[in-house]
Amino acid sequence: VHTYQWESRDLAPDDDYNGYNLVYKPGAKLTRTGRILQIHTGAGITGDFVGGSAGDYAQMGIFARYLIGRDPLQRELIFNDVKRALRKLDKMSMGPVDIALWDIAGKVHGAPVWQLLGGWKKSLPAYASTYHGDENGGLDTPEAFADFAEQCCEMGYRAFKIHGWSHAPIR
């Protein structure tokens, strides 16, 4: 597992609510941490996964030794055994490992993972998304969300995902 960091500008935790949601905050700088999982085979092939949380990777310590010497192409066997090992946990660490094993399979078979999974589409529609609503001059009103949605539509997006205010009243 490798970690890397980068700086995001104009982004900060929402201090007005719970400190977990990221919101637009002009002038703010936020250091973010990312992770790369690499699984190396005895044949010299490396499977990669980029993403995941610190908690996901902490769980991997429970079953990392199990992976040593296993056939990485036996993804279902590995999945079922690890599922049992993590039966009392949320199993969030299984996804990154599974994707890295699929990456190995793609490299072994000389095909992209989407082909191994039976994919046929050459493109997929994209959508625009927001950070959470805030109260600091970013997406701070329904009108601001509407203006941003119109701007995204002008940029060619045909769908728009809203992350509203976390502290909004439940209706």
Regions found by a protein language model. Name each.
Residues 1-43, 47-48:
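Structured beta-strand/loop patches that form or line metal/cofactor-binding pockets in enzymes
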Residues 2, 52, 163:
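Conserved residues at the C-terminal ends of beta-strands
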Residues 5, 24, 40-109:
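Metal- or metallocofactor-binding catalytic centers and their adjacent structured scaffolds
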Residues 22-23, 112-113, 146-147:
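Glycine-rich, charged/polar anion/phosphate-binding loops
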Residues 29-30, 117-120, 154:
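Solvent-exposed alpha-helices and their adjacent loops that cap or buttress functional pockets
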Residues 32, 93, 140-141:
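Residues that cap or flank secondary-structure elements
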Residues 98-138:
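Glycine-rich, aromatic-flanked loop segments that form ligand/cofactor-binding clefts
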Residues 123-124, 128-171:
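Metal-dependent enolase-superfamily TIM-barrel catalytic cores that perform enediolate-based chemistry
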